[in-house]
Amino acid sequence: MSAPTIPGLEGNAPTTNQDMLNWIAECAELCQPDKVVFCDGSDEEWEAIAKDLVEKGTLIKLNEEKRPNSYLASSDPADVARVESRTFICSKTEDGAGPTNNWRDPDEMRAEMSEHFKGSMKGRTMYVVPFCMGPITDPDPKLGIELTDSGYVVMSMRIMTRMGKEALDKIGDGPFVKGLHSVGAPLEPGQEDVKWPCNETKYITQFPEDRVIWSYGSGYGGNAILAKKCYALRIASVMAKDEGWMAEHMLILKLISPEGKAYHICAAFPSQCGKTNLAMIQPTIPGWKAEVIGDDIAWLHFGDDGRLYAVNPENGFFGVAPGTNYKSNPNAMKTMEAGNNIFTNVALTDDGDVWWEGLENEPDHLIDWKGKDWTPDEDCLSSHPNSRYCVPIEQCPVAAPEFNDPKGVPVDAILFGGRRPDTVPLVTEAIDWQHATFIGATLASGQTAAAAEAKVGTLRYDPMAMLPFIGYNVGDYLQHWLDIGKKGGDKLPKVFLVNWFRRGDDGRFLWPGFGENSRVLKWIVDRIEGRVDAKKTVVGYTAYSKDIDIDGLDTDPKDVKAALTAPADKWQMDLSDTEDWLKSLGPKVPQEIWDEFDFLKTRIKTANKDGNKALDNMKTK
């Protein structure tokens, strides 16, 4: 079969993959770019695209001495974050998407979006970006191609994925996930471009059965860097369900004991709950070390030994900048020091460096993220709250070598955690995998309904921290978790619920957090090794305060004890919200989850009547 003509392609395509060539030709005919370029991932390509974007004003080259090979982008104020209201799961049936996703008929959506894509790349270059999810050496890799008219996306994809010629060669004549992205800002001949092209109309659309992603109108982060949430979670979660593995919104941490034994921990936290800080934690306990394998996404699969193994499908960190500093996350700061960064929507200093809220040494003058002069007297922030740094993992001083191992690492523990000022103890072990699935399904941040100034319904539920990212029906997703539990049996990792944000009656944080969270991780290791007991509470097996190592810590032991309480009366107040939440997830919520809800109610009733001691004598969970 002869290769199709790709409008705008100079020379021959560096592939013979007929399906790929046909698809690129179709998209080029639809979007009408001036030219089509296959990306090879080289330094020369990076430099050429960066030079072009600097000339257009999209990027500012930072001070080479302070930030080598690094750039600052400032987006349109209307294009600063993921747009969940414009994110669609276009499964073949509405039931396939379920109640937590926006669904549209896939044929109707294709027709509607095709009208927007028609001519959307006029005056621009269509970049063909081949990429590999996870280590390029994986014998069975997950691959993809993103077609985009954004050089910013190409540069970001080079950091966030294994991108370029190697990935294209890996695809060969095989299958791949197809991603089409346009900022939706065509240029007529002679028309001057804007610094950050985008469109008021936005779509971020996944077609899960077809393994296809279409994104239109946004140039920002997760909307445009299609390998991130679109592929690594929404599409991958469907692939995982079909193939018997898991795609989860989890960090992967390697913790090394003083004896040199390594433990691998995955953790799922909703946003603003300290996930990136935990991923790059610096333990404060003598003799303990930590290394990072991933800060955001984990793909979990069963190894030949029957254990769950975790792989990070990404190659970079795409972190929230504000609040990141040498106290909260020194390793992230050191990673950025090495250069090769793309910063987005942070402030520019007078000497060509970057700054954001929470960083040390506030300057007297900045250019803010909107390009305006800024001083500390301003009543606005210098950096957008969702401003970002994008940097290669390999630069992190505590990057574990295993982040490049396609086998992944055996998972010893999974952590769930929200931001709860009350009710949830500092650390609790789940009773079993079914109970763990219930804990994940009802993961929440916020206050109980009876808390000061709180209203009923102020708990924000985020199952497994995956609410915006489950690519199919949430009930089926929970069933998949239960099925994994049945398959894994006694080789499954232990699961824990943590809460770094417990406050006292006076509003103070009871636990110092940050690097001191290593003390909680030590207790988790002690549980894995069977070295410590735990007390049964309404939430599970909660730590005794005496077993949390606070040696050398300037924290009142009474505060630690208070942080480890699970007051049954407070848990009672959560029940109505939790029941409403589970009902809202529809009829596909597995019966086992409702059984766990009934067990929770029984534990609360028993504890309220006879105290926590009575829980030890219960015949049921």
UniProtKB/Swiss-Prot annotation:
One of its GO terms (molecular function) is manganese ion binding. Its main location: cytoplasm. Keywords: Cytoplasm, Decarboxylase, Gluconeogenesis, GTP-binding, Lyase, Manganese, Metal-binding, Nucleotide-binding. Its EC number is 4.1.1.32. It is an enzyme of class 4 (lyase). Pathway: Carbohydrate biosynthesis; gluconeogenesis. Pfam families: PEPCK_GTP, PEPCK_N. GO terms for cellular component: cytosol. Its cofactor is Mn(2+). InterPro entries: PEP_carboxykinase_C, PEP_carboxykinase_GTP, PEP_carboxykinase_GTP_C, PEP_carboxykinase_GTP_N, PEP_carboxykinase_N. It comes from the Bacteria. GO terms for biological process: cellular response to glucose stimulus; gluconeogenesis; glycerol biosynthetic process from pyruvate; oxaloacetate metabolic process; propionate catabolic process; response to lipid; response to starvation. It catalyses: oxaloacetate + GTP = phosphoenolpyruvate + GDP + CO2. GTP binds at residues 272-277, 388, 419, 514-517. It is found in: Cytoplasm. Catalyzes the conversion of oxaloacetate (OAA) to phosphoenolpyruvate (PEP), the rate-limiting step in the metabolic pathway that produces glucose from lactate and other precursors derived from the citric acid cycle. Belongs to the phosphoenolpyruvate carboxykinase [GTP] family. HAMAP family: PEPCK_GTP. Monomer. This is Phosphoenolpyruvate carboxykinase [GTP].
